[in-house]
Amino acid sequence: MFDIGFSELLLVFVIGLIVLGPQRLPVAVKTVAGWIRALRSLATTVQNELTQELKLQEFQDSLKKVEKASLENLTPELKASMDELRQAAESMKRTYSANDPEQASDEAHTIHNPVVKGNETQHEGVTPAAAETQASAPEQKPEPVKANVPESTETASVAAIDAEKKSAAPVVESSPSSSDKP
């Protein structure tokens, strides 16, 4: 791998022994060996992935060649039917894109009665009546959620709601009466 001979390796070992000493040299050798193992495994992994990608690419290329060859070997009837299907699909795409999506939705939700013929001609010229006013519902306030509350507080909250409803009711002005005087 590094193209190092035995004498060169022995020289590196002796220099390492002198520089690091006998106690730190085994730890340094283990560390360097771990780095070399990690680099080798990384290189092997990259090489395997590249070969897999190349094989996959070759396989895809061969599949494309086979598909082209099989399409060229089709009978004229099959080619004609494939062309018809393509044309039908293209015309469907064009008609769908030409139509307004809302109009297509309205048409899909329209019920056509084949028994009654000329239904549209009978109602030709008739316009629907327009409403002068629209109906509306009175506003409703959400009721408070009732949890495990004692009945005394529950009746108090009901009384508060009733008082709130009464205060929301229109007040009719009246003339002062004798009961208002002290």
Curated annotation (Swiss-Prot):
Molecular functions per Gene Ontology: protein transmembrane transporter activity
Presence of the UniProt keyword Zinc in the record: no
GO CC terms: TAT protein transport complex
Key words, A-Z: Cell inner membrane, Cell membrane, Membrane, Protein transport, Translocation, Transmembrane, Transmembrane helix, Transport
Membrane topology designation: Single-pass membrane protein
Localisation: Cell inner membrane
Keyword Transcription regulation: no
Region (Disordered): 88-107, 121-182
Biological process (GO), any one: protein transport by the Tat complex
Family: Belongs to the TatB family.
Entry-linked HAMAP family: TatB
Known partners and oligomeric status: The Tat system comprises two distinct complexes: a TatABC complex, containing multiple copies of TatA, TatB and TatC subunits, and a separate TatA complex, containing only TatA subunits. Substrates initially bind to the TatABC complex, which probably triggers association of the separate TatA complex to form the active translocon.
Job description of the protein: Part of the twin-arginine translocation (Tat) system that transports large folded proteins containing a characteristic twin-arginine motif in their signal peptide across membranes. Together with TatC, TatB is part of a receptor directly interacting with Tat signal peptides. TatB may form an oligomeric binding site that transiently accommodates folded Tat precursor proteins before their translocation.
Protein name: Sec-independent protein translocase protein TatB
Organism listed in the record: Salmonella typhi
Biological classification of the source: Bacteria, Pseudomonadati, Pseudomonadota, Gammaproteobacteria, Enterobacterales
